[in-house]
Amino acid sequence: ATDNDPAARFKAQWAHRHWTQFLATSQKATIAMVNGYCFGGAFCSLAACDIVITADDATFGLSEVNWGILPGGNVSKVFADLVNHRNAMFYAMTGRTFDGAKAVEMGIATLAVPADDLRDEVVSIARELMEKAPMVLAYTKQAMRNVGDMDMNMAYEYLATKGMALRAADPKDTRGRGMSEFL
């Protein structure tokens, strides 16, 4: 619909990029629920979420090669970050599809469940997350998003500093209460 309208295409690309950045940087936990199809640009939204639950029979793929185009708009980068190099090359170059179970095996999704159970599973996980301290979840999300690109020493320093910042910012002393309940 935007092929012959560069302004509309730019607007759509900007909106998609803004949305994926919002998902990735949100202080709240985000859950993607995949039921049906996940192709091309949908991988960007999916990768921006913290948890991905898919129907085991959902269909995933990078079909761009079949249409004579590149998986652009950061789709190639996102897909290459999600899966190992061999899988990235295979699926990007063949345009083949794969199911939800394979998406879990490749690290794209967290969990695959029967389609009839998908909504209930996502709601159950959302409720579980709602029982956690929001500030702790936000700090955990930030930490997990950042430490992957750090070496061990840098990660240690970052996490120690992040932990101190959390303790200072947490008016409910979630750590203290959690430790006393654990012990």
Task: Give the role of each language-model region.
Residues 8-9, 60-61, 80-83, 88-91, ...:
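Short, surface-exposed, polar/charged, turn-prone segments marking secondary-structure boundaries
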Residues 21-134:
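Crotonase-fold acyl-CoA enzyme core
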Residues 1, 95-100, 120, 124-127, ...:
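C-terminal alpha-helix plus adjacent terminal tail
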Residues 15-19, 74-78, 87, 139, ...:
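Hydrophobic alpha-helical segments typical of transmembrane helices
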Residues 1-19, 38, 66-68, 151:
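Glycine- (often His-adjacent) and acidic-residue-rich active-site loop
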Residues 12, 83-84, 149, 175:
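Short linear sequence motifs
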